[in-house]
């Protein structure tokens, strides 16, 4: 009997009348993937109820192989060491034993000692964590070097003030719990400059270098969006219009959100930036949900905002992206077919119901027009409540592999077939 997989309906793809309750459940014949092998069963520690919210691929022990650091919501963050060929082994208590509401993770050599360090952000308990790596797979808790807490749910790392050191940008939400640090407004973004006099220690520049307003941020991305040589910021929000902050080169940001053509209300959970149209200018992708697993509310259609070449962004989603009604808490940009054009992997969850669906793959034709290539690219077993994704060459074959996070479903590892 031919196996089947879940896919968007032909009707929804065509953009005709859509039924959010049923569109995601049409069945199509499954063909073997020509791009990825789902190696979860043999390469990833089994944890089907874990809330794997994000991951980064980084060599923590200097053996030349990428390891994986995973943020865990309502749990303890995890370190998976790469034992070779992308097989991951769980190293318990690498980041302590305390359970937190961890949302995202990023890595950088913050103290310039040649070893990679790791920062996690937490939402409901409001306490972020910084761990300094020793280059041998061990970490020391240095969270006291972070100058403030918040209810964090967006995280990015990069040199924001031009001094050559990686800084930290944290987007915050407005949840209220007794444990949260209320010394500062809950939902304002945080900007931590790496102290040039003491690399790996941080100075809070939020009050002097950021617009002072309440926000509700679930996603953050850094990129040079106005082509002036410094990193700007895009903030993704589930309740407010998404925002663009432009950098003056010294880490002072001004609101330039009027450059974003936001044509419909969105509940955005993640944002990515890449040159998707091949014109040399960076474009913006917003991954959206209809609601946080409540009733049908906003249109969850993924949105593509195309750079017009001057740092202004037009919404061209209708003519460039497949139409869909599933909700997407996350996705990633990756050239999965090796043609030199960035493609998209798109997480899919049916809401209402919070039903796990198959990961989607959208192929770029090179001009920023995308077609659904799920049946060809994604193995039929790659199903879950897909959350934020890490990527890199785990098995050393020259292809890009992807770890798909899972909220209460098994995180799944896709190994690329590209250069095997």
Predicted regions: what they are:
Residues 1-9:
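Bacterial N-terminal signal peptides
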Residues 15-50, 81-100, 132-150, 188, ...:
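Blade-edge motifs of beta-propeller repeat domains
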Residues 43-71:
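Beta-strand-rich domains and repeat architectures in extracellular enzymes and scaffolds
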Residues 53-62, 103-112, 152-162, 218-227, ...:
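Beta-propeller blade termini
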Residues 63, 67, 113, 117, ...:
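Acidic carboxylate motifs that coordinate Ca2+ or other divalent cations, activating on Asp/Glu
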Residues 68-72, 118-122, 168-172, 233-237, ...:
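Hydrophobic beta-strand segments that make up the repeating blades of beta-propeller
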Residues 74-75, 123-126, 179-187, 237-240, ...:
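Short, solvent-exposed loop/turn segments at conserved positions within beta-propeller repeat blades
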Residues 388-420:
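Blade-level signature of beta-propeller repeat domains, shared across WD40, Kelch, NHL, RCC1
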């Amino acid at each position: 009997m031919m196996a089947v997989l879940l896919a968007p309906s032909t009707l929804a793809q065509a953009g005709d009348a859509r039924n959010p309750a049923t569109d995601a459940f049409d069945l199509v014949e499954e063909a073997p993937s020509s791009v990825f092998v789902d190696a979860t069963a043999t390469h990833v520690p089994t944890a089907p109820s874990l809330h794997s919210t994000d991951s980064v691929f980084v060599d923590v022990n200097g053996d030349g192989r990428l390891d994986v650091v995973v943020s865990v919501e309502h749990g303890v963050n995890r370190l998976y060491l790469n034992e070779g060929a992308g097989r991951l082994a769980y190293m318990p208590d690498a980041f302590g034993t305390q359970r937190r509401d961890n949302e995202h993770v990023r890595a950088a050599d913050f103290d310039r000692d040649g070893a990679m360090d790791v920062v996690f952000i937490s939402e409901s308990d409001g306490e972020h964590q910084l761990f300094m790596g020793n280059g041998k797979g061990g970490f020391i808790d240095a969270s006291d070097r972070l100058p403030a807490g918040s209810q964090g749910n967006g995280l990015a790392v990069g040199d924001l003030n031009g001094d050559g050191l990686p800084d930290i940008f944290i987007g915050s939400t407005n949840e209220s719990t007794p444990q949260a640090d209320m010394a500062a407004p809950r939902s304002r973004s945080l900007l931590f400059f790496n102290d040039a006099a003491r690399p790996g220690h941080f100075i809070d520049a939020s009050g002097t270098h950021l617009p002072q307003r309440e926000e509700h941020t679930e996603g953050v991305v850094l990129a040079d969006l106005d082509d002036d040589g410094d990193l700007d910021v895009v903030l993704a929000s589930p309740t407010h219009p998404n925002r663009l902050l432009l950098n003056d080169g010294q880490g002072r940001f001004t609101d330039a959100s009027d450059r974003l053509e936001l044509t419909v209300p969105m509940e955005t959970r993640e944002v990515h930036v890449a040159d998707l149209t091949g014109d040399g200018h960076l474009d913006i992708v917003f991954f959206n949900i209809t609601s946080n697993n409540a009733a049908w509310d906003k249109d969850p259609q993924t949105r593509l905002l195309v750079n017009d070449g001057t740092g202004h962004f037009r919404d061209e989603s209708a003519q460039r992206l497949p139409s869909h009604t599933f909700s997407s808490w996350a996705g990633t940009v990756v050239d999965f077919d090796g043609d030199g054009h960035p493609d998209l992997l798109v997480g899919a969850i049916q809401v209402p119901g919070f039903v796990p669906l198959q990961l989607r793959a959208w192929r770029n034709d090179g001009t920023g027009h995308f077609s659904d290539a799920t049946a060809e690219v994604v193995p039929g077993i790659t199903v879950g409540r897909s959350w934020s994704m890490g990527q890199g060459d785990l098995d050393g074959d020259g292809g890009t592999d992807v770890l798909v996070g899972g909220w209460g479903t098994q995180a799944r590892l896709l190994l690329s077939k590209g250069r095997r």
